[in-house]
Amino acid sequence: MAKLHDKYQETVVAELTKKFGYTSVMQVPRIEKITLNMGVGEAVADKKVMEHAVRDMTAIAGQKPVVTVARKSVAGFKIREGYPIGCKVTLRGERMWEFLERLVDIAIPRIRDFRGLSAKAFDGRGNYAMGVREQIIFPEIDYDKIDKIRGMDIVITTSANSDEEGRALLDAFNFPFKK
């Protein structure tokens, strides 16, 4: 079991129950899923690019991503409906906890010129979205084997009802928010 999952069950639940005055353990916010999304617009011109993106995402997430396709044709971007334009993966359970641990302990500290995560990236329902500019911050990515530096979106979906609860949950996991 991942360290963060143990920490959640042993200390975070008690902390949040005390802070927000919950009457039941089931009211305590928890992380439900983490979604990683990588937009690969240049895959329209070169199909190999998508294979590299899928390989990188598989290494980072530990499971194979789903290739996302264009819903509409857009002449300005030279894409047609059904063209592969990205990939995404949804992590739940044990893989989710392991990824979160790697993200907080290893990947985020490796971001260049990092000054803390923005606390304004909550959506009003306690879910947190962040962007990563380089996939090379993850230790699973071999710098010599990448074809291009790509970014990705990371969305942490929680069962929190408000941004305050969501922030308290992520703070308990030592997320480095800006002060």
From Swiss-Prot:
Task: Mention any one GO cellular component term assigned to this protein in its UniProt record.
Answer: ribosome
Keyword tRNA-binding belongs to the record: yes
Under InterPro entries, the record lists: Ribosomal_uL5 (IPR002132), Ribosomal_uL5_bac-type (IPR020930), Ribosomal_uL5_C (IPR031309), Ribosomal_uL5_CS (IPR020929), Ribosomal_uL5_dom_sf (IPR022803), Ribosomal_uL5_N (IPR031310)
Question: Which GO-annotated molecular functions does the record name?
Answer: rRNA binding; structural constituent of ribosome; tRNA binding
Database matches in Pfam families: Ribosomal_L5 (PF00281), Ribosomal_L5_C (PF00673)
Q: Name one GO biological process term.
A: translation
Give the keywords, sorted. Answer: Ribonucleoprotein, Ribosomal protein, RNA-binding, rRNA-binding, tRNA-binding
Q: Is the Heme keyword given for this protein?
A: no
Please explain the role this protein plays, according to its UniProt record.
This is one of the proteins that bind and probably mediate the attachment of the 5S RNA into the large ribosomal subunit, where it forms part of the central protuberance. In the 70S ribosome it contacts protein S13 of the 30S subunit (bridge B1b), connecting the 2 subunits; this bridge is implicated in subunit movement. Contacts the P site tRNA; the 5S rRNA and some of its associated proteins might help stabilize positioning of ribosome-bound tRNAs.
Xref: NCBIfam families: PRK00010.1 (NF000585)
Subunit field text: Part of the 50S ribosomal subunit; part of the 5S rRNA/L5/L18/L25 subcomplex. Contacts the 5S rRNA and the P site tRNA. Forms a bridge to the 30S subunit in the 70S ribosome.
Q: Which family does it belong to?
A: Belongs to the universal ribosomal protein uL5 family.
The name under which this protein is listed is Large ribosomal subunit protein uL5
Q: What is the lineage of its organism?
A: Bacteria, Pseudomonadati, Pseudomonadota, Gammaproteobacteria, Alteromonadales
